[in-house]
Amino acid sequence: MYNTHIYFSDIGIRFGHQQVLSGTELEIMSGRCILLCGNNGSGKTTLLRIIAGLQAPDSGFVNTGIGKYDWNRCRQQLRQTAVYLHQQPYMFDGDVISNLNFSLNSNLSRKQRIDRVNSALEWAGLENIAKNSAKTLSGGERQRVAIARAWLRDPQILLLDEPITNMDQDSRLRTIQLLINLKQQGVALVVSSHDPVHFESLTDTLLQISDGRVHGFNTTDNVTPIHYRKHLHEHVK
C-alpha cells in the first residue's frame, strides 16, 4: 500500500488568449479516485499532463507533504510518481508479452522478467491473447495491455485520459474492474471521461471543469447513486 498525498494549488495555464485553467486546486490521495468531467477543450487532458509532470503550468504549487513548492521544482518527482495513459495507448511492435516487457526494469533476471510478465497477464486477464500481435488488438484489449504495463511500473498515481471511449460493454466492465483492483491496492487514480456514469462504482470525487474553473463534488459523503446521477444531470454537460 502507498501513502500518497499530494496537493496542487493555484494551477493556472493559458493557451493563446484562452485561460484553460485558473486557480485550480486538487488533492490526490492513495486508494481514491478523482473523475474529471467537462467539454472538449475544457482542460481535462491539460490537467492530467500537469499532474504527470509533462506539461508546465504558467503558475501553480505542489505540496507532497514536506512543504509547498513551485510546480517546476517538483516536476521530476511528479514524473517518477505518476503514470499517464493516453486515450489511444501506443503499442510497440511484437506480441502482448513483448509489450509488457518494455515496462520492466532491465536489471531483472530472465526468470524474474518471465514471472512478472506472467503475473501481469493473469492480473489483467490477458493470458488468451499473450501471443497476439499488439498492433491488431481491439481498443479494449489495448487499454488493458496499457494498464497492465502501468501496473508493472508500480505507480503511486495512475492518470487515465478517456480510458473507456468506444468500448463495448464487456471491455468497459473489464477495464473498470482493473481500475477498482488498482484502487484497492492503494493506487491513486485520476480519470477523465465523457461517460462519467460508467465510473460510479469507482469515483470518490467528481470534478467538473468549465470556464477554466474546477467545481468539486465528493461522492463519499453519504451520497447515494441517485444523488450521483442527479449531480451528473445538473452539472456535467
Briefly describe each language-model feature range.
Residues 88-98, 108:
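Conserved catalytic motifs of ABC-family nucleotide-binding domains
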Residues 133-137, 141:
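Conserved ABC ATPase signature
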Residues 158-161:
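Catalytic Walker B motif of ABC-type/P-loop ATPase nucleotide-binding domains
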Residues 193-194:
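H-loop/switch region of ABC-family ATPase nucleotide-binding domains
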Residues 61-77:
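ABC ATPase NBD Q-loop/coupling interface
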Residues 111-129:
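Conserved ABC ATPase "signature" region
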Residues 52:
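Helix-to-loop junction immediately C-terminal to a conserved catalytic motif
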